[in-house]
């Protein structure tokens, strides 16, 4: 039964990833006043399927000087970790209801750094290594603010369990009392998932395509899928944390519909940002985090610690 549950979670995610690639190409196309994919199937709807067949039937090449085992393990690990992060997300019921769901999410996103690092190192190419080092520095840096913002939200929530966030936001979405946190969280998720304007890892002008430059066919597709899985997961997480979806125990379907619409809107905003903004310079990226976000999040964290005490109430213990 548990295996069926896992499959029922993974298969829709992979389908969503496949069609997100199509949505992205369509949205970017229309924003640049062109059509986007429109040949394969009606309105280009079968394009992701054609892409998948092409990628997975090609011969997976690898450089003769690369470290074989690590070269193969890295993309598999990237996708596995990306899918594992969906386990504690309440939609409205999580696959496994963890007491420390948030901590699990943080741990998994930290582990995802290793797959990027290994892929860059195992490729035995300067471009790949520089891309990987950039990605790791960026991910680790932005995780600091993500963790502090999460802590601030959880202080209002009163528990590390993600399911209680639904109860906390029954009357008021957390985006309203903590909108500065939400803004910083959203920008940090962009940086965490290596999306434009923070896609320095794949700076085409200087690094060809970043850490996955030596990958082709199947393994490349796995990295690609991991990236998009992470994008959808981060937006789902943002929805749970700040845009508490409407939950009625008698009609749990309403929650899922509400949750999906909000996640979709956030994902489209990711694409909109990609179409609108140029890439940051590396020092600007680090300056934004260490000089702007970090002091502000620390101050807001202290504010959230003192808030329940000043209002002479303790956080709800669930």
From Swiss-Prot:
Compartments, as annotated in UniProt: Mitochondrion inner membrane
Any one GO BP annotation for this protein: aerobic respiration
Entry annotated with the keyword Lipid metabolism: no
Membrane-related topology note: Multi-pass membrane protein
Recorded catalytic activity of this chain's protein: a ubiquinone + NADH + 5 H(+)(in) = a ubiquinol + NAD(+) + 4 H(+)(out)
EC number: 7.1.1.2
GO molecular function: NADH dehydrogenase (ubiquinone) activity
TM stretches of this protein: 2-22, 70-90, 100-120, 146-166, 171-191, 222-242, 253-273, 294-314
Family annotation (PROSITE patterns): COMPLEX1_ND1_1, COMPLEX1_ND1_2
Keywords, alphabetical: Electron transport, Membrane, Mitochondrion, Mitochondrion inner membrane, NAD, Respiratory chain, Translocase, Transmembrane, Transmembrane helix, Transport, Ubiquinone
Enzyme class: translocase
Entry's Gene Ontology cellular component terms: mitochondrial inner membrane
Record bears the keyword Isomerase: no
Family: Belongs to the complex I subunit 1 family.
Role this protein plays: Core subunit of the mitochondrial membrane respiratory chain NADH dehydrogenase (Complex I) that is believed to belong to the minimal assembly required for catalysis. Complex I functions in the transfer of electrons from NADH to the respiratory chain. The immediate electron acceptor for the enzyme is believed to be ubiquinone.
The protein, known as: NADH-ubiquinone oxidoreductase chain 1
Naturally occurring in which organism (per UniProt): Rhinoceros unicornis
Upper classification of the organism: Eukaryota, Metazoa, Chordata, Craniata, Vertebrata
